Amino acid sequence: MAKVQKLPLPWSECICPICQEILLEPVTLPCKHTLCNPCFQMTVEKASLCCPFCRKRVSTWARQHSRTRTLVNKELWEVIQKQYPKQCQRRASGQESDDLSDELTSCPVPVLCKPGEIRQEYEAEVSKIEAERTAQEEAERKASEDYIQKLLAEEEAEENLHAEASQREIEEQLKRDEELARLLSGDMDLSNASCTSVSPVTSKKVVSKSSKIVKSKQRVSGDIERFLSPKPRRALAAFGINESRNSDTSGSCILLDEDEDEIPDLSPQCPSTSLIQERDVELPMPYLPNCYKLESDAASQQDSCSERNDICNGTYSCSDSIDVEVSKTMEQQRATADSQEYRMETNAMSYSTPKRKCEECYLDIEEKAGSCQSVKKKKLSLSEDSPVLSVHAGKFIELEENLYERRKQEEHDRLFALQLQRELDKELKQVNRGKGSPDEYQLRPKRGLKLQECNDSPLPHNEQTPVQDKGGNTQSGYSPDENKKPSRKKSITSSQVRQSRAVTNTERSSEGMNVLKPSNKQPTILDLFQRSAGK
């Protein structure tokens, strides 16, 4: 509430600036503007809860004071009543004072907004709200970035822990693998040592000590190298000849076996040393295929053991694997060729005596040379026949492929022909009733034209009438083919005959009806005269 000035109050302060009359129950707004209660009710409450002079919003103040009934400035109202009781009484009774117009003083100038002032206020408010919103978004973005960085740091720490754990597991696994490899290598060494220490089974021929030492050294030291770089057949033959030279005087040629369990005897077929020195390249080493099979089986077992050992120790490479595969394929081819040679030789020698003394086995140098040449020729013939066999096999494969393709095409053509035949049968079964087709629908001719034709051309008496069967179908005669359709001309003539007979029947019936029909028409005088004249 505004402070009331001391007495006496000037007349200008007791006049309402809106109605220009004395203040009746004055209301002092928070902006220090005063107006009477009726003007406040009309302008502020009904129009807008703002001051009519400065446009300050007074909605909260008005609701609060109207609730407590303290809108009227009672102190100012009491002062005005004491100073101007007559004017207050007139205003309360509704009478207008005459002397108010003469005593008008200067009213406060209404305050108006400058051009663009409201727009500036609006833009300032909008910019303020926008700045607050951007500041809030920036704060939220910073908080989210901090949270994301925290999560990333936690994930990175977890990944590091996981990587360390996996690395430890890998290291432990490697250690375990190394221990296992050491154990396996120790077992392999023990097994090799036991194999070398085991004496061979009782046999007819005994190998000399020097050959045993050579074999044990070769087995212990060159297990893997023997498979990685296989020896040619000539070297094997020379090695076998040297072994036979160091053996007993019986002259038997002994092949080195991996297991040394069975050492079969061979017939003395080795040539003399001079011939071997001269033809070291050409002569093959005599051997038995069974021994070779046993040797290859033992070699394959040692191969697998050596490969496992290399894999466990981590020294097995791609080049070694390729060499092993190549050596295996070469050994297999060699085994097949040698088995064929041996079969041919055994077939040729089956008619000769199997056992002879050592002295009778040796032939002359010329005969030996001829036998060596014959063996060489056999080898060459086998080597020449092998590509021929491969060519024939390729031709057979091509012929089989061509035959298979031809049969496949014939089956495809047969299925296609069956499909076409089905479609053709379906088309033949369907009856075409379209215009211009042989089975088209016959249109009814006009009745007047038919009657004229019937009257112009009377039917002959000897014409054969169509006979109807039980199904109602007309038959002009017997036809052997039941499915044969009647011709178009016959069907037209039969329809004409039926129509002409119907017309004659209708004419006769109409004449009879005219005779029998009673005359409902009243007779005229002329009819009566005609009847009387007729009688």
From Swiss-Prot:
Signal peptide limits: none
UniProt zinc finger (RING-type) residues: 16-55
Name of the gene this protein is made from: rnf168
Chain ranges for the short sequence motif MIU motif 2 as given in the UniProt record: 406-429
Region ranges (Disordered): 429-535
Segments carrying motif UMI motif: 145-153
GO CC, any one term: site of double-strand break
Subcellular compartments: Nucleus
Pathway listed: Protein modification; protein ubiquitination
SMART domains named in the record: RING
EC number: 2.3.2.27
Domain-related comment: The MIU motif (motif interacting with ubiquitin) mediates the interaction with both 'Lys-48'- and 'Lys-63'-linked ubiquitin chains. The UMI motif mediates interaction with ubiquitin with a preference for 'Lys-63'-linked ubiquitin. The specificity for different types of ubiquitin is mediated by juxtaposition of ubiquitin-binding motifs (MIU and UMI motifs) with LR motifs (LRMs).
Residue ranges with Polar residues bias: 462-478, 492-507
Keywords recorded for this protein, A-Z: Chromatin regulator, DNA damage, DNA repair, Metal-binding, Nucleus, Transferase, Ubl conjugation pathway, Zinc, Zinc-finger
Motif LR motif 2, chain ranges: 433-444
Catalytically driven reaction(s): S-ubiquitinyl-[E2 ubiquitin-conjugating enzyme]-L-cysteine + [acceptor protein]-L-lysine = [E2 ubiquitin-conjugating enzyme]-L-cysteine + N(6)-ubiquitinyl-[acceptor protein]-L-lysine
Compositionally biased intervals (Basic and acidic residues): 429-443
Pfam families assigned: zf-C3HC4
Official protein name in the record: E3 ubiquitin-protein ligase rnf168
Family (UniProt): Belongs to the RNF168 family.
Motif (LR motif 1): 112-130
